[in-house]
Amino acid sequence: MNTFTSNSSDLTTTATETSSFSTLYLLSTLQAFVAITLVMLLKKLMTDPNKKKPYLPPGPTGWPIIGMIPTMLKSRPVFRWLHSIMKQLNTEIACVKLGNTHVITVTCPKIAREILKQQDALFASRPLTYAQKILSNGYKTCVITPFGDQFKKMRKVVMTELVCPARHRWLHQKRSEENDHLTAWVYNMVKNSGSVDFRFMTRHYCGNAIKKLMFGTRTFSKNTAPDGGPTVEDVEHMEAMFEALGFTFAFCISDYLPMLTGLDLNGHEKIMRESSAIMDKYHDPIIDERIKMWREGKRTQIEDFLDIFISIKDEQGNPLLTADEIKPTIKELVMAAPDNPSNAVEWAMAEMVNKPEILRKAMEEIDRVVGKERLVQESDIPKLNYVKAILREAFRLHPVAAFNLPHVALSDTTVAGYHIPKGSQVLLSRYGLGRNPKVWADPLCFKPERHLNECSEVTLTENDLRFISFSTGKRGCAAPALGTALTTMMLARLLQGFTWKLPENETRVELMESSHDMFLAKPLVMVGDLRLPEHLYPTVK
């Protein structure tokens, strides 16, 4: 009995203590909740009631999760659809949500400068896409690799070892050889048939030049074509390169809905794998053999970009770069060379043949600066201001692509008063910047004179981002000097050495863009004739 009474008493005491503890815990929780609520209330009261969180840039309302992807799939090419949205909304900055990604499009130079000058470091990354992963061998390169240690490493190598002013001067002879080869090749085409396909010719000149700088040779074939033109191997390589360029940032559905990667719903993945494999087929044997030669001591002199990549050492004296880094970086740089210069020269020639007065002025300038007793050289470029004004106008009015490569926001920010969330992909519109009527009078008219300034030398770069020739900022073009040399020398040699007219029964070029990209709808074909003494034309070597 005493035992029962004692146990009952203990249970009563325990229950009382438990009840007291629960009450105290509940009170403590309530006190904490009240305190947090008061703090939040005070913070809200202290906040400026008129200060609102900035809105996203204007844009269409999409579906949950998938955003505007259904509309995107029906609206090809996507770049025209995005520009039509901006036109409908009458805005110079817009936001279109694709999956969970905010795609921000910009056509205003002032906003572009805010992004690439004032907030450049914040927009220094690239998106993760299937195409990039394939081309960069798992993000080991410079141009298309997202921001991080690997990007910094490769960017430093490219900027300090490959495209610095000293290297540019050092490789002058190789560029000069390709300028002469272009003149010899065009001479042979003019003498044999008179007809020249400018798209084919300009692309392969640029391809020859970058191959010479990269590998020390202009061709992937053991045998060269007698007239100086590309071989079957070179043509296959060039076609694969341009196919890859067309699909590197092509609004692939799996880039916005990653769970669809592998299904290849729009065929982009197969195209990228095949085109990348073709380029690797030509690049990799040369790279592997060269690495072996350096390792065995059979090659000790640096003669081209590939030698530079292989010979760079780290602080311990070991090779800084692996083959897995060298191969995709070379592929990336080779791809970066041909499209922009070749497109500008083809459009410039098309515009000039429709406006003979511009063509006449350009040839008069070359004759005045250079004469007809020698060939134009890179040293003449500073004085060829009208020729460069023509090229600036071609870059402005006829950009090689509708948008620059995407810039990814590394954190939340505000641009032009609008909220830009972390991870947003910002697309600067080459098309919209160059044709912005608030910036350019009569923007659809080809007027080289608008770029002339008596007080200064004309350059192809555009630092104020009123148009984009060679992009700027941390992710800008690494080699504007090389781009300027290739583009200007190509046009100058074609104008100095030859007169040009349209084929028989054609009176003007139809200046129409392709239905799926920004290239001229039909490749420009013209008939040439010699305008210099024959002894000045180089021979194919």
Curated annotation (Swiss-Prot):
Membrane topology: Single-pass membrane protein
EC number: 1.14.14.156
Gene3D superfamilies: Cytochrome P450
A Gene Ontology biological process term: response to bacterium
Domain of life: Eukaryota
One term under GO cellular component: membrane
Catalytic activity: L-tryptophan + 2 reduced [NADPH--hemoprotein reductase] + 2 O2 = (E)-(indol-3-yl)acetaldehyde oxime + 2 oxidized [NADPH--hemoprotein reductase] + CO2 + 3 H2O + 2 H(+)
Binding site for heme: 477
SUPFAM superfamilies assigned: Cytochrome P450 (SSF48264)
Keyword terms of this UniProt record: Heme, Iron, Membrane, Metal-binding, Monooxygenase, NADP, Oxidoreductase, Transmembrane, Transmembrane helix
Cofactor: heme
Spans through the membrane: 21-41
Record family assignment: Belongs to the cytochrome P450 family.
Name under which the protein is recorded: Tryptophan N-monooxygenase 1
Taxonomic classification: Eukaryota, Viridiplantae, Streptophyta, Embryophyta, Tracheophyta
Gene of this entry: CYP79B2
